[in-house]
From Swiss-Prot:
Assigned keywords, A-Z: Cytoplasm, Detoxification, Stress response, Transferase
Keyword Transferase: yes
Induction: By ethylene, salicylic acid, copper and the bacterial pathogen P.syringae.
Protein name from the UniProt record: Glutathione S-transferase F7
Length: 209
């Protein structure tokens, strides 16, 4: 077996999502740096691993995957006997985790990623942050966080009282937003604030910074 390989960029939120899952499972892996600024993700040999030209790509021996949330689910299930449990096998828990992943991927991440782009990445590229876009996206994020605040008033984490993939998937975007004025949206909601402090302090999360 060739072992686990992750092809990605350390600053990519999608790549970090996979790395956090691997660290939660205490798994050894090889990280292959794909330089985004040089367009390596749009060329061979990376395109062979992900025809859509997005990081990360993943290999576990002969098994190949792309799309970060598919990769984390594979890691959580295939290595269920390793490290920390990130999923549950109960029917209702499975459904709850699936719902949480859908909400994160369709409601939280698109908005959060736009805010990261405007406030973190654009300045790095010498571009100007569009304050109007930031205001619009913060209003959208506030609505998502209101849903999270209600949910976290009922359980310690988003899917249950245990840390799962639902929580893990939010960490990379949150890590970036904590260094921006958008942090106020987390701080204004007590349950969300406590949850953010909890999940971002996990050893696995600290290892990707």
């Amino acid at each position: 077996m060739a072992g686990i390989k992750v092809f990605g960029h350390p600053a990519s939120t999608a790549t970090r999502r996979v790395l956090i899952a691997l660290h939660e499972k205490n798994l050894d892996f090889e990280f292959v740096h794909i330089e985004l600024k040089d367009g390596e993700h749009k060329k061979e040999p990376f395109i062979f691993r992900n025809p859509f030209g997005k990081v990360p790509a993943f290999e576990d021996g002969d098994f190949k995957l792309f799309e970060s949330r598919a990769i984390t689910q594979y890691i959580a299930h295939f290595y269920s006997d390793k490290g920390n449990q990130l999923v549950s096998l109960g029917s209702k828990d499975i459904a709850g985790i699936a719902m949480g992943i859908e909400i994160e991927s369709h409601e939280f991440d698109p908005v959060g990623s736009k805010l990261v782009w405007e406030q973190v990445l654009k300045p790095l590229y010498g571009m100007t942050t569009d304050k109007t876009v930031v205001e619009e996206e913060e209003a959208k994020l506030a609505k998502v966080l209101d849903v999270y605040e209600h949910r976290l008033g009922e359980s310690k984490y988003l899917a249950s009282d245990k840390f799962t993939l639902v929580d893990l998937h939010t960490i990379p975007v949150i890590q970036y937003l904590l260094g921006t004025p958008t942090k106020k949206l987390f701080d204004e909601r007590p349950h969300v604030s406590a949850w953010v402090a909890d999940i971002t302090s996990r050893p696995s999360a600290k290892k990707v910074l």
